[in-house]
């Protein structure tokens, strides 16, 4: 499975001694920032597999987003989270994974796995629901969803390297002899199709689960204009009512810089226990508000229905609420934003490339990351450092495997010295060519959390004579740097997904991946450790025995925690507020599923 790009005060001590980094449990025990009191004033309601109660139709959900969509195109959505948030409401995946029960469940299709142990092959048979349609808003026109839609998307969109889909490389498996073989798809009939794996794989449903677009629109565009024709479909300047939907919603209005309006799709397949079509909501109005303070003001004024709290909002919304809303809380997030450094050889003439490609430099940066200070000053004590690669729900999570490069200025200085980076008489860090150590740190303009975190990083590195220039930019500019120009130094970024399965991140961890952030799309591994990661990732994918698999994934995690290509930041405890005009019977909020409002209805 591939990832998508997404973007997530006490006195400070300035001694050079190591500062202990407290866990969330320790912070709670010490009463830091009144965590116990805050939790007592909020609602804990994680989803644990409960059935959803029948509701009633009606109501308009009012929400806000930070970012403009780049397109309404499913292919573009792979690299743009703002686009993905919109497009995915008009599509559906074949399956969904229930993290509570740890099992796959049907969505658009049912799946059956057939293993041929003698031939060492595997086939996944899918059968689409019979009530799936590409529907058009305010029209009787409906086009049946068939296996041809899935097969076309797999072969002609994801499977065409010219389309630059992040799913391309995952269609190939490395065979025991080192050769590559393709995972083929074949049509059985109008509803049924099958993926044939040339060797047995550990997570075939994860590997084959996918979204797909309408063949009757994308195929003519590709025949006429190739990959560019595909990517130019559904631009933001079209009439959105012309976009078909097989999902919960139609997009019926888009006013650039202002808002989007969605209407429920009455032909959507999902029904409640009484057979009523979902969602219950008739409409959703989404305002585009880049400024987080304005988002907060809209919520407090009753002009939006929900709001995800920042640390600085806790006191005002939790301790001084007006009774018009309820705040839910969740445990620390499974994933975290990270700090990473550009190792792309396109920049090999820059001094930063020489520094960033040495693991001792990256390890030193991890030792200069004062996570306790970030937790206290940025998160008000409501977070904890992410030291492990895999989260606890991952079956191969190993609590003994933790990051070893914690906040320690002396150790950082020793690591830098080992690669010839030392302070001069004026306290400025210089490399072995007498160049001052200075680099940029790119962050999103809309995120106050990233801005505050970057300021702490700059301050901590300055203690050792390293200059950091904070570059604030919008998300689209960050995406351009990461995927097109590669002209960045370091960046704070986040990815969707949380490694619930060890083989998630097929476009992140292998060196060929387009989200192998620090040096993407490698033809051959640039380093020995990346070659080893490629090998382990591949072996782990095909290892069924849990004991053998544990050894593989342990080494995989250990290498990445040692090499520090991604330095993870904080796991944040979540707080989410919702207007009390809604019925909360089917509302849940937790760190695995986020905010569950699919079955919400108006009081």
What residue spans do the PLM features occupy?
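Glycine-rich and polybasic anion-binding loops at the starts of cofactor/ligand-binding domains
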Residues: 569
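N-terminal lobe/hinge region of extracytoplasmic solute-binding protein
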Residues: 43-48, 59-119, 244-246
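Bacterial N-terminal signal peptides
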Residues: 5-13
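Surface-exposed binding/hinge segments that line
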Residues: 163-227
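A structural "hinge/loop" feature
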Residues: 48-52, 65-87, 108-109, 136-143, ...
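Conserved positions in beta-strands of structured domains
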Residues: 113, 186, 250-252
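Extracytoplasmic/periplasmic ligand-capture domains
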Residues: 16-51, 99-100, 117, 121, ...
């Amino acid at each position: 499975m591939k990832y998508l790009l997404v973007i997530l005060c006490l006195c400070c001590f300035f001694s050079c001694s190591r500062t202990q980094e407290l866990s969330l449990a320790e912070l709670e025990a010490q009463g830091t920032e009144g965590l116990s009191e805050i939790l007592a004033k909020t609602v804990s309601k994680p989803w644990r597999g409960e059935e959803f109660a029948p509701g009633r139709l009606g109501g308009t959900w009012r929400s806000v987003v930070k970012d403009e969509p780049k397109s309404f195109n499913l292919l573009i959505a792979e690299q743009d989270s703002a686009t993905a948030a919109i497009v995915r409401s008009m599509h559906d995946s074949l399956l969904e994974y229930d993290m509570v029960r740890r099992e796959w469940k049907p969505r658009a299709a049912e799946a059956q796995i057939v293993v041929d142990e003698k031939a060492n092959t595997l086939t996944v048979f899918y059968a689409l629901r019979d009530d799936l349609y590409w529907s058009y808003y305010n029209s009787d026109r409906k086009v049946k969803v068939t296996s041809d839609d899935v097969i076309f998307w797999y072969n002609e969109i994801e499977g065409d390297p010219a389309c630059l889909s992040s799913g391309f490389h995952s269609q190939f498996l490395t065979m025991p002899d080192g050769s590559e073989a393709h995972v083929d798809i074949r049509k059985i009939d109008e509803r049924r199709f099958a993926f044939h794996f040339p060797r047995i794989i550990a997570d075939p449903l994860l590997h084959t689960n996918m979204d797909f677009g309408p063949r009757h629109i994308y195929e003519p565009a590709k025949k006429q204009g190739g990959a560019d024709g595909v990517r130019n479909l559904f631009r933001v300047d079209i009439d959105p009512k012309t976009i078909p939907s097989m999902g919960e919603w139609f997009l019926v209005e888009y006013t650039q810089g202002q808002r989007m309006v969605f209407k429920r799709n009455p032909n959507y397949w999902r029904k409640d226990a009484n057979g009523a079509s979902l969602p219950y909501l008739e409409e959703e109005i989404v305002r585009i508000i880049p400024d987080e303070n304005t988002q907060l003001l809209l919520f407090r004024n009753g002009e939006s229905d929900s709001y995800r709290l920042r640390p600085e909002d806790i006191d005002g919304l939790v301790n001084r609420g007006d009774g018009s809303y309820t705040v839910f809380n969740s445990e620390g997030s499974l994933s975290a934003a990270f700090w990473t450094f550009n190792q792309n050889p396109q920049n090999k003439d820059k001094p930063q490339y020489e520094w960033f490609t040495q693991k001792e430099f990256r390890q030193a940066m991890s030792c200069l990351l004062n996570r306790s200070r970030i937790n206290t000053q940025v998160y008000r004590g409501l977070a904890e450092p992410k030291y492990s690669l895999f989260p606890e729900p991952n079956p191969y999570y190993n609590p003994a495997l933790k990051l070893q490069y914690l906040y320690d200025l002396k150790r950082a200085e020793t690591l830098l010295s080992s690669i010839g980076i030392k302070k001069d008489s004026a306290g400025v860090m210089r490399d072995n060519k007498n160049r001052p150590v200075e680099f940029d740190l790119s962050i999103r303009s809309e995120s106050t959390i990233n801005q505050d975190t970057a300021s702490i990083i700059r301050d901590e590195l300055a203690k050792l004579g390293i200059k950091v220039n904070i570059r604030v930019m919008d998300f689209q500019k960050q995406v351009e740097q990461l995927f097109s120009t590669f002209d960045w130094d370091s960046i704070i970024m986040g990815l969707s997904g949380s490694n619930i399965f060890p083989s998630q991140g097929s476009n992140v961890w292998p060196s060929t991946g387009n989200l192998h952030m620090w040096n993407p799309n490698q033809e051959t591994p640039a380093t020995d450790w990346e070659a080893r990661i490629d090998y382990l990732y591949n072996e782990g994918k095909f290892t069924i025995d849990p004991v053998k698999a544990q050894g593989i994934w342990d080494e995989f995690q250990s290498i990445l925690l040692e090499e520090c290509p991604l330095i993870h930041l904080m796991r944040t405890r979540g707080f989410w507020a919702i207007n009390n005009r809604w019925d909360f019977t089917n509302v849940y909020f937790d760190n695995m599923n986020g905010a569950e409002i699919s079955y919400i209805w108006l009081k």
